[in-house]
Amino acid sequence: MASAAAGASICIKSASFSPLAPGRISSLRSVSLPVSRKSFPSLKSSKSSFALRVSCQAKPETVAKVCGIVKKQLALPDDSEVNGLSKFSALGADSLDTVEIVMGLEEEFGISVEEESAQSIQTVQDAADLIEKLMEKKGH
């Protein structure tokens, strides 16, 4: 979320909320905190709005599996560097390649990715985060 003059807020979205004890949350995926410009004096002179995105990242093993699938689908050499920050477009993927990558991910992880969600995937990390979100919904 963003705000221009009076203040701003930090928003982290969540799929589930399970209280364990006062002040503790299990499977935290969302927190919204108001932020005063007084807390950040350097922002007082800024006329533009700002946003801070904090996301919970997928497990390293999920990212590694996605990297492997991306390399396979794009027929990249084994020594190609593919990591969470790798953009599909930078790896040479076109829209058809991206569809094939998503199909490979669906098969590997036993999930179904809706078209709208598939279109939002731009990086390996995006794909891994979406996979974990879908698997969590599925109960894995």
Swiss-Prot record:
User: Pathway, according to UniProt?
Assistant: Lipid metabolism; fatty acid biosynthesis
- Mention any Pfam family matching this sequence: PP-binding
Q: Does the keyword Lipid metabolism apply?
A: yes
Q: Domain Carrier: where? A: 60-135
Q: Which InterPro entries match?
A: ACP, ACP-like_sf, ACP_chloroplastic, PP-bd_ACP, Ppantetheine_attach_site
The Swiss-Prot or TrEMBL record annotates one GO molecular function as:
acyl carrier activity
Q: Which PROSITE patterns match?
A: CARRIER, PHOSPHOPANTETHEINE
Instruction: List residues, modification O-(pantetheine 4'-phosphoryl)serine.
Output: S95
Q: Where is the transit peptide?
A: 1-56
User: What does the UniProt keyword field contain?
Assistant: Chloroplast, Fatty acid biosynthesis, Fatty acid metabolism, Lipid biosynthesis, Lipid metabolism, Phosphopantetheine, Phosphoprotein, Plastid, Transit peptide
Identify the GO cellular component terms for this protein: chloroplast
PTM annotation: 4'-phosphopantetheine is transferred from CoA to a specific serine of apo-ACP by acpS. This modification is essential for activity because fatty acids are bound in thioester linkage to the sulfhydryl of the prosthetic group.
Alphabetical list of Gene3D superfamilies matching this protein: ACP-like
- Enumerate the subcellular locations listed in this protein's record, separating them with semicolons: Plastid, Chloroplast
Annotated family = Belongs to the acyl carrier protein (ACP) family.
Q: What does this protein do?
A: Carrier of the growing fatty acid chain in fatty acid biosynthesis.
Name of the molecule in the record: Acyl carrier protein 1, chloroplastic
Species this chain originates from: Cuphea lanceolata (Cigar flower)
